[in-house]
Design a protein with these regions (language model features):
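Glycine-rich phosphate-binding active-site loops on the catalytic face of alpha/beta enzymes
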Residues: 19-21, 43, 72-77, 96-110, ...
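Short beta-strand/loop segments at the ligand-binding rim of alpha/beta enzyme cores
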Residues: 11-16, 64-78, 124-137, 179-190
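Conserved, mostly hydrophobic/aromatic
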Residues: 41, 60, 93, 145, ...
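N-terminal amphipathic alpha-helix/helix-capping segment at the start of soluble metabolic enzymes
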Residues: 1-28, 61
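Glycine-enriched alpha-helix->loop->beta-strand junction motifs that scaffold or abut catalytic
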Residues: 45, 64-68, 96-100, 126-129, ...
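Catalytic cores of alpha/beta
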Residues: 78-96, 137-151, 184-191
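Active-site-adjacent beta->alpha loops and helix N-cap segments on the catalytic face
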Residues: 2-3, 28-29, 50-69, 80-88, ...
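Conserved beta-strand positions in the central sheet of alpha/beta enzyme cores
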Residues: 15, 48-50, 101-103, 133, ...
């Protein structure tokens, strides 16, 4: 699918997240089982799946044929963010066939000394046709990511950073403001 086809397919629809990491009940070391969750989500009508590992990207794409928003959760020393924090994870997601790459676009410390703006520019230089989803926690980060050229903004980190942790539920105001002030899809996630 083209970038336009993917963005049109998800517009106004619910995207289902099918992910489990080590230590969670649905994580199985020997084999991904997230493709089964994705199968059910497809039957329920989701236009895309969000998932958090290379093996799940591959298994879900094979099972469903749906566009996949892929990410890798990994904590490196010196990095406050853990969602697709380095080019290694971006490379792995692209190689696995991820249709959209989600990455932490908060303005927190990056262990390699680059800014999130520099990281986005590096990704876009290496993969000019990539669809990027910025996982952000507040308005400033969303606007910054949009200005850097990401294709989708998600409120994924709202309520999960030191400076937004007082949120008890979804930040509907953040979603509304970003939808009004940007010209890209805004996906509501987070607490």
């Amino acid at each position: 699918m083209t970038k336009k086809e993917i963005l049109d397919a998800i517009h106004g629809k619910m995207i289902i997240s099918c992910q489990a990491v080590e230590g969670e009940p649905l994580y199985v070391e020997e084999k991904s089982i997230m493709y089964l969750m994705a199968r059910a989500a497809k039957q329920a009508g989701t236009p895309a799946i969000r998932t958090s590992s290379i093996r799940d990207v591959i298994a879900i794409k094979e099972e469903t044929g749906l566009p996949v928003i892929g990410l890798v959760k990994i904590q490196y020393p010196g990095y406050e963010g853990y969602i697709t924090p380095t080019m290694k994870e971006v490379d792995d997601l692209v190689a696995a066939g991820s249709d959209v790459v989600a990455l932490d676009c908060t303005l927190r410390k990056r262990g390699d000394g680059t800014t999130v703006n520099e990281f986005i520019a590096q990704i876009k230089e290496k993969y000019p046709d990539i669809i990027l989803m910025a996982d952000i926690s507040n308005y400033e980060e969303g606007i910054n990511a949009w200005k850097c050229g990401v294709d989708i903004v998600g409120t994924t980190m709202s309520g999960y950073t030191d400076y937004t942790s007082k949120k008890d539920g979804p930040d509907y105001e953040l979603m509304e403001r970003l939808a009004k002030d940007t010209d890209i899809p805004v996906i509501g996630e987070g607490k």
